[in-house]
Amino acid sequence: MKSIASKWVLGLAAFAFAASMSSALAQSENTGMGNWKLNVEKSKYSPGPAPKSLNIKFEPAGKGVKVTTEGVNGDGSKNATEYTANYDGKDVPMKGSPTTDTVSLVRKDANTTVRTDKKAGKVMATLTRVVAKDGKSFTVAVVGTNAKGEPVNHMLVWDKQ
């Protein structure tokens, strides 16, 4: 059985990547695009478990971003998510996540993007992504509730590949 917490983390991680795009678009058409890897050692999960690995690919898509993730959950099962969104706050479908049906993105400033995850219309998490000024890393603060109704507070650290 796949760990719901691990799947949730993977879905949230997808936001992190999309958020990178929001600040990237604000700075330049090419900043923030490409491949990113979760730094599991520097990231913090409450509750866990942390995924064993997670990679995100960011690609421009019209006025927004296409985000795809591939990873290995803490229990060893594989997971992948995908969505394409503009930075207009409108809900769009997320594929592959058991904990998130839709996401929406809003760009706060050149380096900060907020993603809202929903399941059956209910907000499950808010993810705030901040891109480092050097463009080599970003963090994502995740605050919400997991499928069990438990509070979630994660800090994800990503490195550009």
Residue ranges with predicted function:
Residues M1-L12:
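Bacterial N-terminal signal peptides that target proteins for export
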Residues K2-S3, L25-Q161:
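Hydrophobic small-molecule pocket/channel-lining residues, especially in calycin-type beta-barrels
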Residues G11-S20:
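Bacterial N-terminal signal peptides
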